[in-house]
Amino acid sequence: MTTQLTTETRMCPVRDLNPQQSLRRRRIYPVNRTGHGLYYRHNDLNLQFRSPLNQSISFTISAMNLLLLRTDQIKQNIAIVSGRQFDQLSKVHRAEIGDSVRIGEINGLMGTGIITAMDEQSATIQVNLHSSPPTALPLTMILALPRPKMLRRIIQTIAAMGVKKLYLVNSHRVEKSFWQTAFLQPDALREQLILGLEQARDTHMPEIIQRKLFKPFVEDELGEIITGTNALVAQPSSQSSCPVNSADPISLAIGPEGGFIPYEIEKLNQIGFESVHLGPRILRVENAVPALISRLYPA
């Protein structure tokens, strides 16, 4: 039985409980009232629907995606979590001692962890890593530097969607002040990448390379970067539509708001980029990025 949500969902804080834990600890939280009944979240493992006829349907969901840890946080299979990640555990997921959480090691394996101790500032977790992360997309992205606030969202998006190499490049329509933002500092970029990886349950950290001069980058580096790939540049005025469900490695160039100027498109075409479009609608960069990735490599 399938029921369509008809109103805004109000998600309540939910624990990440182990299915073997006692029923006594499994709480039911009202989540959303629909035209067909009331949805409940039954711990983090099941979403239970109760219809007007009192019929109950349950299916598996996940409340906590992944707690991504640095290698130096894990010593002898024990990790201590504090700061933002501890706040997520304690305040959002209402975790307690004995609860199970999903764990990943940056650039390593994924698995589970059991909370063995907690205080007001940190949690101690017994870690068991045993499974591989999702396969990376065979996609290299060349992106004209977006404005700072948009940059953070895009970085999270590309990390969540499996892109592992991103070149941030200059363009005529990129404002010089964008290159001065603190969001381009390594720690700031890493923070956004971790958020994206935690969202998608991935551990492999993408590589971000910054190039502030467009012409030298295209003439001296980009030709070698795209070798062995299908090189595409997003251009709304193109006569060719973007490929769908590609089986080949792709190098994808995306311009700034307003697009690459004709000179830049010409330089890219000269080294082998094919101009493609997504249709008659003009999208913001933050919307074009996931649209293009999803079209090229649908799930």
Give the ranges of each region predicted by the language model.
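N-terminal positively charged helical leader segments and presequences
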Residues: L45, F49, L53-S131
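RNA substrate-binding interface of SAM-dependent RNA methyltransferases
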Residues: P133-N230
